[in-house]
């Protein structure tokens, strides 16, 4: 949020630009991650531009436009933490967002986890020492660090692979999907996407 109480950032900027190119007015709705797909399916909003990883499981119930950027799983600790390797996560409390792919990954590793509704809570719990590490998509956390909000360290995870983040829409809307994809493709071709990425992320993340 900015000083005018407006929702700002990379995702809002991308969504707003796509809507503008489609001749639509943007209404940004903030919701918790654990209910974000349900809200889409209940028609509370028409698209989710919220760093949602494209997975086969999600693709069974929703459609995706994009990907509009690529990220990967990343593990963060407070700067100066004794936790510096993935192996050490087994000995501490790990924070994840409820319903994200990283929650299942952490459970599969057998970690002692706490689940939260979204990144703001994750970062706050890490800052307050209630978890030793958090697992999240790399880009959103890097954005928070770039804004100077948090002093964090990255734990090297050699098994992490790139993940495409897509714009989620309800199934059965081929015209909407095509129009959004065209707007996104045009943004990437004419330099608008890169300008937005440079402003909010500091580089090209396609």
Q: What feature does the model see in each segment?
A:
Residues 3-6, 53-54, 78-82, 92-101, ...:
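Short coil/turn segments
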Residues 1-51:
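Extracytoplasmic small-molecule ligand-binding "clamshell" domains
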Residues 12-21, 87-88, 93, 98-101, ...:
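Extended ligand-binding regions for polar small-molecule ligands
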Residues 35, 52-60, 123, 132-161:
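A ligand-binding cleft/hinge motif common to bilobed small-molecule-binding domains
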Residues 1-4, 15-25, 86, 99-119, ...:
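Ligand-binding cleft/hinge of the Venus flytrap
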Residues 12, 27-38, 81, 98-100, ...:
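Short helix-initiation/N-cap motifs at beta->coil->alpha
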Residues 69-77, 138, 142-185, 203-206:
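Periplasmic-binding protein-like
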Residues 23-25, 41-50, 93, 127-140, ...:
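Alpha-to-beta junction loops
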